[in-house]
């Protein structure tokens, strides 16, 4: 028998199919099913912690990392009076309290997270700095060539806090940084960028 050829790729909701043909006789074929893909989901909110949300605040929950063929089929709230959710994943804090948001996929996989609506603003507890282009975390020391640019991106925890990030350089002659987090290496030396 020859090598396997995929006739239909597997998805999260449907098995795939592969076949191989007899290399000697040319006519005989063997077909086999390919297992469905394992359903997966990633959210831009923590599923293992309570997500704080200010009263009347809205936040867009984003879904990513779905296996081929899968999609979100429903968003539901355990208590719409406290937290409402649209069919696109936008949550809104309507009343002080807690509610669970449930996301169901076509494959049957579900994800849940708890939202706690509070009167006061959501305070930032920590933040991380990333390279906006590569989305990789920035190390404490970064080497740059003269003329090179690096754009910073700050991610706050919790994601529902709304901090205003500012950037400054200890030596603008060596490395300057603008209000959008773009660092420009000016000349050889060391400078500290503060966020």
Features from the language model and the residues they span:
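Extracellular modular ligand-binding repeats in secreted and cell-surface proteins
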Residues: 1-39
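Extracytoplasmic soluble-region selector
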Residues: 15, 23, 37-195
């Amino acid at each position: 028998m020859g090598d396997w050829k995929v006739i239909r790729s597997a998805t999260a909701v449907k098995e795939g199919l592969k076949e191989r043909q007899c290399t000697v006789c040319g006519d005989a074929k063997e077909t086999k099913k390919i297992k469905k893909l394992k359903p997966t989901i990633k959210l831009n909110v923590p599923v293992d912690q309570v997500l704080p949300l200010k009263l009347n605040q809205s936040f867009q929950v984003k879904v990513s990392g779905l296996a081929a063929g899968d999609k979100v089929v429903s968003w539901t709230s355990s208590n719409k009076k406290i937290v409402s959710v649209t069919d696109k994943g936008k949550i809104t804090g309507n009343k002080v309290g807690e509610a669970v948001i449930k996301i169901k996929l076509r494959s049957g996989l579900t994800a849940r997270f708890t939202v706690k609506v509070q009167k006061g603003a959501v305070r930032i507890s920590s933040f991380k700095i990333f390279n906006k282009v590569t989305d990789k975390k920035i190390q404490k020391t970064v080497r740059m060539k003269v003329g090179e640019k690096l754009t910073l991106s700050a991610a706050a925890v919790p994601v529902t806090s709304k901090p205003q990030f500012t950037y400054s350089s200890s030596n603008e002659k060596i490395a300057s940084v603008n209000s959008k987090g773009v660092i420009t290496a000016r000349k050889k030396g060391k400078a500290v960028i503060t966020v």
